Design a protein with these regions (language model features):
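C-terminal regulatory/interaction module of P-loop NTP-utilizing enzymes
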Residues: 1-169
Length: 169
């Protein structure tokens, strides 16, 4: 159902992750996962990075309500896990924003493929970097695919930026 799918913040590329196998297991001492899970639970529950993300992030014009919320929640989660001490450079932050947008774009592309009209055709999600340039984030696996190049349905008018487009706002 598209209504449920639209509520996903990110669609992670599982095909880019290594398959779990016995070579990742050890016979030596290891980190107990219960302890790690409890540490992450405490860290994630008692730290709020959403406000920081909201003030540092400038998103493009095709980013709509659920897109914005999903992108910001994903970036806040990255900051909690990767920078629990609180410091993050602008380059790192922009990388996290780009990856969050890429994941959200995957959700939008899948919804656009399943919907007969142009409700989800605005897949050109972007952000404004620290130099003031608008960066449209593409998914590597769909670059050059007709449904991504031209997400509009015939006969419906939707303003969509060109694939890979970057320009000053």
């Amino acid at each position: 159902d598209l209504a449920v799918m639209d509520r996903f913040c990110i669609y992670m590329p599982g095909w880019e992750m290594p398959k779990n196998s016995s070579e990742y297991l050890t016979n030596n001492y290891g980190f107990i996962t219960d302890y790690l899970a409890e540490a992450f639970h405490y860290q994630l529950k008692h730290t709020n990075r959403y406000e920081e993300v909201s003030t540092r992030t400038k998103l493009g014009k095709f980013v709509e309500g659920r897109d914005e919320k999903g992108i910001k929640k994903t970036v806040a989660a990255y900051l909690k896990m990767l920078h629990p001490h609180g410091e993050c450079s602008d380059e790192e932050f922009e990388e996290y924003v780009a990856y969050a947008i890429e994941g959200r774009r995957r959700v939008k592309e899948q919804m656009n493929k399943r919907k007969p009209d142009d409700e989800f055709a605005n897949i050109g999600l972007s952000f404004i970097n620290t130099q003031g340039e608008e960066i449209v984030v593409d998914c590597p696996e769909t670059m050059g695919v007709e449904a991504t190049i031209n997400p509009k349905k015939p006969g419906v008018n939707v303003d969509v930026p060109e694939e890979g487009q970057s320009h000053d706002p």
